[in-house]
Amino acid sequence: MRKKLLSTLLATAMAVTMLAGCGSNGGQQASTPATENKTETSAEAKTDDTAGTTTTEGGKIGVAMPTKDLQRWNQDGTNMEAQLKEAGYEVDLQYASNDIPTQVSQIENMINSGCQMLVIASIDGDSLGTVLEQAKEKDIPVIAYDRLIMNSDAVTYYATFDNYMVGTKQGEYIRDQLDLDNAAGPFNIELVTGDPGDNNARFFFGGAMDVLQPYIDAGKLVVKSGQTDFETVATANWSTETAQSRMDAIISANYADGTKLDAVLCSNDSTALGVTNSLEANYTGEWPIITGQDCDKPNVKNMISGKQSMSIFKDTRTLASKVVEMVDAVMKGGEAPVNDTTTYDNGTGVIPSYLCEPVFADASNYKELLIDSGYYTAVSYTHLTLPTTSRV
């Protein structure tokens, strides 16, 4: 089923890309599921040019992040900068305030200011083709960070978490918490995913729906709003406010009469926060299961207080460490370590990739995963306790 889904996503998204340019972002093709190809290997990059690298330690690395508005990108950038500097590199770290022209300008400046390699978390996967042509002309390798850059043959490697697995873990959590294989049902669920210009959003949603769709088809899960297709449930810029506004409308139309809402699939924490805000203001029934991703601090607090059921934890220290390893290998004239050479096609060919494995956090294990590991300090959470009536 996963092969069929990912192939369908690629075909659909590539068609949208050709018709809409910088509109909805393209999907990726999987001739072999990512989780079936996790043995780390060293693979040649899609392009053979390495003239822009140096065989000695040191050099200047450009790191382009999309925004500081989401906590996770702050942590990604900070972790990356610290580890690259520790490895002996000069770092040009830039945030673009979710503005595409700003990010394009920042990358252009990195290219012209002597950066020998680029690590880019794109705002929109289809928006960087022209500026990356400049990088290609100067033989500057490019690592797409967490978000695949589409339709550019300048992309050398891709580093991310297993985004399909993120979605399946969210779907499995809902399945298990509602005991869908044994309970009579039906249960009401609503669906909220991410930005249509973010390639990962289709993977998150696709993975979750591979788990949940059979129960929807069987009538055990019911989407009362009727909103189930990706374009309808997508949330521009992963905006908390947009997710909240849409959830306000869904509650008003479908749950204001006391109808029970059992679960809300949210692909990440910023959308989950919007859904939570809406429920607090408008919903009077038993609190539903709410999923998320990124373990942002406000959402961890909501998990502890019973307002959010779980969040996928993607330890950015792990991803940053792997990217530094990849950068170091290429800068020394070698090949970056990868563990997937079949899944991520950006429209110009398969991009050699390294996929880190995500885990999920909830009220039972957040302390071990987030605090005991040093990812967060306990100061912000010590005054909160889990309610005895929580469903999580």
For each feature predicted by the language model, list its residue ranges.
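Bacterial N-terminal signal peptides
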Residues: 11-17
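Bacterial Sec-dependent N-terminal signal peptides
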Residues: 1-8
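A residue-level marker of the well-folded mature domains of exported/periplasmic proteins
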Residues: 5, 18, 22-384, 390-392
